[in-house]
Curated annotation (Swiss-Prot):
GO terms for cellular component: cytoplasm; membrane. The lineage of its organism: Bacteria, Bacillati, Cyanobacteriota, Cyanophyceae, Synechococcales. This is 3-hydroxyacyl-[acyl-carrier-protein] dehydratase FabZ. Signal peptide: none annotated. It is found in: Cytoplasm. The active site is at H57. Coiled coil: none annotated. Belongs to the thioester dehydratase family. FabZ subfamily. Keywords: Cytoplasm, Lipid A biosynthesis, Lipid biosynthesis, Lipid metabolism, Lyase.
Length: 151
């Protein structure tokens, strides 16, 4: 995947809320900095200490749970397909996760840069994205995420 060279906001948090169904505390994309509908997206997730998961994961050494990193990547993947013309209306949900690996801890104060690229879309109902999340240029998580349309 190519590195984004822009820090301009392409989609604000308000615009993202108009495209994705997720709401607090599960809205995990703060802004989109690059977006090619139907092809790829790059977004930012600012990790802050006042997020609810850090009360229990772990109070003495807060770490962002891996499942939330994967969910943030999936939400960025969802932004790719929400802007595609000719897709049926409905909700895209997880259908599978392949090859996900965690390479470094993500902690409060980090900024996740999440890049997703659409690998395939079959029958306008089943899709696969390649996703990676980095912090300060270091790979934190990567994998392939599958989704399907729920009528």
């Amino acid at each position: 995947m190519t590195e984004s060279t822009t820090s301009d906001v392409v989609l604000t948090s308000e615009q993202i809320a108009g495209l994705l169904p997720h709401r607090y505390p599960f809205a995990l994309v703060d802004r989109v900095i690059a977006h090619d509908p139907g092809v790829s997206a790059t977004a930012i997730k600012n990790v802050t200490m006042n997020e609810p998961q850090f009360q229990g994961h772990f109070p003495e050494r807060p770490l962002m749970p891996g499942v939330l990193i994967v969910e943030a990547m999936a939400q960025v993947g969802g932004l790719i397909v929400t802007q595609m013309p000719d897709l049926p209306k409905g909700l895209f949900v997880f259908a599978g996760i392949d090859g996900v690996r965690f390479r470094r801890p993500v902690v409060p104060g980090d900024q996740l840069v999440i890049r997703c690229e659409l690998l395939s879309l079959k029958r306008k109902r089943f899709g696969k994205v390649k996703a990676e999340a980095t912090v300060d240029g270091d790979l934190a998580c990567s994998g392939e995420l599958m989704f399907s349309l729920v009528d």
